[in-house]
UniProtKB/Swiss-Prot annotation:
InterPro entries: DCK/DGK, Deoxyribonucleoside_kinase, DNK_dom, P-loop_NTPase. Keywords: ATP-binding, Kinase, Nucleotide-binding, Transferase. This is Probable deoxycytidine kinase FPV151. The lineage of its organism: Viruses, Varidnaviria, Bamfordvirae, Nucleocytoviricota, Pokkesviricetes. It catalyses: 2'-deoxycytidine + a ribonucleoside 5'-triphosphate = dCMP + a ribonucleoside 5'-diphosphate + H(+). Belongs to the DCK/DGK family. Substrate binds at residues 53, 68, 79, 105, 110, 172. The active site is at residue 104. It comes from Fowlpox virus (strain NVSL). ATP binds at residues 30-38. It is an enzyme of class 2 (transferase).
């Protein structure tokens, strides 16, 4: 579907969509291999409406693989595509679900974490960065994309790196620990240091270093904290 068609077809839905006012949108943020997908699956098993990253769309065009193999060529293209597909995923989720929605990352981490990091490194040049900022800001405002809270799965870069190697996605073969350190610093600046950007939302920080797959007590504690966090968003 073309961009104009997506905007027009969803604008009328947004005008009467009570989800935007009565239900909460929460994103799970964290580094590569922080444990987000695992947490998303646990939440899904416990009855939450969850929305996973559109990873297969990125793989379908081989963009994720191209990004890691030749970032100076593909960084801007990938981040533009990621922002677009995540926007569509967000809109589809609002139209399909009648309750709180938990997203695996958001358009905001696309911008404040990944696109910013790639610009800092120099893989996205200043011209591309200005274009990215202009259209991402416009699209976010036009589509009224909002999140009401963030669950920050804070996992140390060393642990993330070990998990990344263990899961052995071929696209990530060239990812170095230095890049994970940079992404960790970006998350800390965004989520742990007073959320300095243009929107401020409550943040629940969860330590992602430990085991919450086989440790049932820890899993129960995390689920309880998330339940309380979402409940407090309504107060």
């Amino acid at each position: 579907m073309a961009f104009q068609e997506l905007c027009c077809s969803n604008l009328l839905k947004f005008e009467n969509c009570s989800l935007l006012e009565t239900h909460k949108k929460i994103s799970i943020e964290g580094n590569i291999s922080a444990g987000k997908s695992t947490l998303i699956n646990i939440l899904s098993d416990n009855g939450y409406n969850v929305v996973q990253e559109p990873l297969e769309q990125w793989r379908g065009n081989n963009l994720l693989d191209k990004l890691y193999k030749d970032p100076s060529r593909w960084a801007y293209t990938f981040q533009s595509h990621a922002f677009w597909t995540r926007t569509k995923t967000y809109i589809d989720a609002l139209n399909k679900n009648k309750g709180n929605i938990i997203l695996e990352r958001s358009v905001f981490s696309d911008k404040y974490i990944f696109a910013t990091a790639l610009h800092d490194i120099g893989y996205i040049d200043d011209t591309e960065w200005n274009i990215y900022n202009e259209y991402s800001k416009w699209m976010t405002e036009f589509m009224d994309i909002k999140i009401d809270g963030i669950i920050y799965l804070k996992t140390s870069p060393d642990i993330c790196y070990k998990r990344m190697l263990n899961r052995a996605r071929h696209e990530e073969n060239t990812v170095k620990i230095d890049y994970l350190n940079l992404l960790h610093d970006k998350h800390e600046k965004w989520l742990s240091e007073n959320n300095e950007h243009e929107f401020k939302v409550p943040v629940l920080e969860i330590n992602g270093d430990g085991d919450f797959i086989d440790d049932s007590n820890r899993q129960s504690s995390i689920l309880s904290n998330i339940y309380d966090f979402i409940s407090e968003l309504y107060i």
